[in-house]
């Protein structure tokens, strides 16, 4: 099993979960140029991460990879407690991060550079930060009295949320007063496997 990851990208979530799973895997850290190379594009025509290769099978998309890892390591609790409700809760939060939080960062990652006017670009950045504050406030409310997003142990949803929180801190998103969210972030930072994943990707 080989995971292709780009430092600090959303693929960090899959990297963390692979370490939580204790499954044997090989890590390949790639850059933007590598992701556009013919060899990489044969595996993932989107030219993006994450990419998980198992034997001759290439799997993309965070939600798919996180669920695959959970199913491949069923005794870890990464897929919940075995009930349909537990798994649905995990996937509800993976979907929230993937469909609501993650895309809201796009202006902050340069998607509005085409506007070519500093004032308009800045406005798009501020709008993104405002929307992200609203979304993270919802997560903070859910985390009150909880350690993890879904159930009694960490899952792929938590790893994915953590990755976006790293982005939020770097992008200047206002997270002040969101105490449960901050406690979650510190809990993740203290995790030995999270630290190992960050170190392996050259992150601090």
From Swiss-Prot:
The keyword Chloroplast does not apply. GO terms for molecular function: glutathione transferase activity. Conjugation of reduced glutathione to a wide number of exogenous and endogenous hydrophobic electrophiles. This is Glutathione S-transferase GST-4.5. Keywords: Cytoplasm, Transferase. It comes from Xanthomonas campestris pv. campestris (strain ATCC 33913 / DSM 3586 / NCPPB 528 / LMG 568 / P 25). It catalyses: RX + glutathione = an S-substituted glutathione + a halide anion + H(+). Homodimer. Its main location: cytoplasm. It is an enzyme of class 2 (transferase).
